[in-house]
Amino acid sequence: MLRAQKLHSLKSSDITAILPTEQSQKLVLAKKNGDVEVYSRDGNTLKLFQVYPDLLQNAKNDPLPPVIENFYFANELSTIFAQCKETLILLSTTNLHEYDRIIDRRGINHCWLFERSHKNKEEKNTYLIYSTINTAKMRVLIWEGRTYKNMMEASLSYRKETIRSIYPGETGITLATDLGIYHWPYNKPSLIRIEKTVKNKFPKDMISALTELKEQAEKVIEKKPKKNSHFDAQSFSSMDRMSRKSSMSSLWYRTIRNERGNKIRYTFELDGNDATPMIIDGATKKIFKVELMHNNEEPFLIATDHATFSESNSEFDHMQYLSSNLLMLYNSSTIKFVDYENGFTFLQQKIPEGIKWVKNLSGTYFLVWTSNDEVQLFSYHVDDGSEDDDQESICGDINDPDFYQLWRKVLFYKFFIDSPHSKELCVSDNPEESLDICAMKLRDLTVMWCLRIFDKFQNYMVQLERSRNSRMIRSKCEEMIIKSIFDLFIKFWAPPQLVILKVFPSAISSLVLEITGQEHHCLLKEAEEVKETYDIPPHLLNRWCLPYLTDTRRHLQNLLSKENDDESRITWCYRDREIKQSFDFFLISNHDDVDLNTMLTLIDTVLFKCYLYYNPPMVGPFIRVENHCDSHVIVTELKIRHMFKDLIDFYYKRGNHEEALKFLTDLVDELENDNTDQKQRQKIDHGVKILVIYYLKKLSNPQLDVIFTYTDWLLNRHNDSIKEILSSIFFYDSQACSSRDHLKVYGYIKKFDKLLAIQYLEFAISTFRLEGNKLHTVLIKLYLENLDIPSTRIKLKSLLETTSVYEPRTILKLLNDAIESGSDQLPTNQLNFVKYLKIFPLSKLENHKEAVHILLDEIDDYKAATSYCNDVYQSDSTKGEELLLYLYSKLVSIYDSNRNSKLILNFLQDHGSKLNSAEIYKNLPQDISLYDIGRVVSQLLKKHTSKMDETRLEKALLQVELVATTYKLNERMSSYGVLSDSHKCPICKKVISNFGTDSISWFTREGRNIITHYNCGKVLQERFNAKNEKSSRIKQKTLGEVINELNNK
């Protein structure tokens, strides 16, 4: 635990006040004769630094200088407050020069000084609070930073009311007196007496829940006749362990001193941002949490039993909160460090000279002012070699000291690691390594402690099994304990073998022996003695136990993924510690080791059984992901429950495809027996068919032979549904199907149905977006063989037009062969269709002139030819213009032969604007009608003129925009601001020098120029951005909300 060591002591007679100042490492002593001695702390020693004779008389030349009764130090103000009978004297910390006084003729009784930070404020606030003599008045003076802000005064309820403790919280000051508890808001001049006290209906933590169950179990036992049961033996088995320190004389001595603790009402706040005031009340033996409401409701107290703490520490009448849930208690002879909730002692130091006053210093030091005016400096540190079986340090059931010692160790190591001074507490050459070891020790102790708690909890639940009283509270306690235990198991990475054996139901815990081969008799010895057992209810096991298994599984998987690395370790984090751990961290000490794969098998198999017994819908999803389950357990359990779909999913995930399909095909014979009627046989046969199809459709190309084999089995057994079976297996959009050899599949399907085989090619090409051209070539051949079907012609045209995967030269050869072979057999329309199809491969080969030749000369389709040329022009205007001129020349040739100018005139009217006019007129036939050509030329001129006008207009608009933009730029560049010699940066409040070389930032905000330093400008910009973002998130009020506001006014 902790051990204190006296480092130094000094003796000075007639001391009236002591003040250690952390800032300057000084110790100030006030004496009865008015002298003030200042000692300097040099390491672990105190040396006299300076003496101020008659300090206060020299300061103000008073005839009767006041006697200093106490000192208070304000670090933020760099001020020492000296309390006298009617005066608070403000002294500078540098030379103890008096610079101000606070005088109250009513007399100053007690004084408190606090410094604390508030939310959203950078500077600390200083609170000086004092009560007056013989009046019920309280006064508080408040400084924000170094600036005095406010003074408030309020009255207590009764004249002779005594203040026990005070603490300034976030919203106000909490006062605890001998007659009540008050809240004093910072913005109000009156105290609010807290009258309302409530108690939690249900236990708030694991230990209080266990205590509640214990009390219920004791009531049940009292009602039953006495039996020599295992539980009775366990309850009284430790009676003979009572130590000498817990003898009757010790208990009597504690009873006599009990009145001191009754006067304590100590107010403090725990560490953390959302901490609320806590009050330890020795009179009621309770601890109160002050709940401060923010909607104008009065505050109230939440009471929790604190009797164990109060009774164990009743002889102490002074308290100070240190950190990490640790309190320092002291009386006239002893100092104790205890945890605030349970009162476990972590340090106990006797002071033979007697104690007047104890003050905690920064770090791991405290100062003691003894009864003989000696000042002693102590340090404290962790001493792992100290006695841990000290019964006097245990607060709890004396009949089970082992459990409470374990609990005490858990709390101690938690305090040690959480402490802000953990490195100073650690006496080691390598404190970081020692703290890591202590963190792992805390882990081991916490797991052991949780298992002990579960043992007790299990015993109590067995005793309460048939009791009908307080079932709701019992249910809440049950969930609280299980949740808390498994939260700690997750946090501390508890060894899975240990947890499964000790906590999980026996049907699941038996897997440890079955999978690892380890019996663990030492762990199961106590459980074997108990005939009645308790199993965690399914809803709690699902909610709190399964996350532990999944989290442990994740850690082991991470280790497995790093198994081939040089350092196979993962990081366990506790607080600010990050400790690299290997697989050994998950094993039980002093037991035969298991390997990582076996441990993963155990975890996954336990998960499977938990899902199977308590959450069956999760079995399927778990089976279908990568897992390490024991195959024998999975197959056996799923077969027993006829969960065949999940079983074949398991086979599939493991890659045991033939085994899975053999199981399915043999299943028909296994399920059919002599008593099965025809209808039932058909139902079984249909079910097996569905499962085999479901399995086959998931297999990929490496298992293609397996697919064909078991598809044959299906087709032989169900020859009346060949098309349905083939479609279900092969026409499936999945990654597995897309990777198959589609030509092999096509050949297989073709043996049974040629039309279905063509449909498969269409499905494969359209669904899987295949890049190879073999399937396309095969499909186009098949289409060309069936041109007499209209739908086939549509598909063929669509395939050639929209697909770019096929090889154009191969397809062109196929089309030429079709034309040559079918020139005498094919009807004219089909022959022209095949010729038309040639334009698609020719287009891909960029043989556009040949395509135009086919369209115009062979098919005689002028519209198709011009459309083709226009498409080429849209994609490439140069090639398109060349192709249009080629088409134009062919049209001129046609005119020469038939003297029909209609095609030329239509072409020039539609596409003349795309061509060079000189080329048009050069090739224009000489004998064409001037009247006809005049109209076309007129339209061409209009189009050219319109295009020229559009170009001029666009140019003018761009010039206007350029002028406007140039004007704005010049206006911006000509703006200026006057920077005077006294101009201060609005952010840092420092003068911006005119002669400096530093960069400055210039903002214009709401018509006002703001000039700052460059770096300050970044801060200002962030504020502007945050403000804009906040305003953009403000919800706009609706009309109804505005009307309601007006009505309320």
Curated annotation (Swiss-Prot):
Keywords from the named record: Membrane, Protein transport, Transport, Vacuole
Disruption phenotype annotation: Sensitive to high hydrostatic pressure (mechanical stress).
CHCR repeat segments: 730-896
GO BP, sorted A to Z: autophagy; endosomal vesicle fusion; intracellular protein transport; piecemeal microautophagy of the nucleus; positive regulation of TORC1 signaling; regulation of SNARE complex assembly; vacuole fusion, non-autophagic; vacuole organization
Superkingdom of the source species: Eukaryota
PROSITE patterns the record matches: CHCR (PS50236)
GO cellular component: cytoplasm; fungal-type vacuole; fungal-type vacuole membrane; HOPS complex; vacuole-mitochondrion membrane contact site
Subcellular location: Vacuole membrane
GO molecular function: guanyl-nucleotide exchange factor activity; small GTPase binding
InterPro entries hit by this protein: Clathrin_H-chain/VPS_repeat, Vam6/VPS39/TRAP1, VPS39/TGF_beta_rcpt-assoc_1
Membrane topology: Peripheral membrane protein
Assembly behavior: Component of the HOPS complex which is composed of PEP5, VPS16, PEP3, VPS33, VPS39 and VPS41. HOPS associates with phosphoinositides and the PX domain of VAM7. Interacts with VPS41 and VAM7.
Function: Required for vacuolar assembly. Acts as a component of the HOPS complex that acts during the docking stage of vacuole fusion. HOPS is an effector for the vacuolar Rab GTPase YPT7 and is required for vacuolar SNARE complex assembly. It remains bound to SNARE complexes after vacuole fusion.
Family of the protein in this entry: Belongs to the VAM6/VPS39 family.
More details: Present with 319 molecules/cell in log phase SD medium.
Name of the molecule in the record: Vacuolar morphogenesis protein 6
Species for this entry: Saccharomyces cerevisiae (strain ATCC 204508 / S288c)
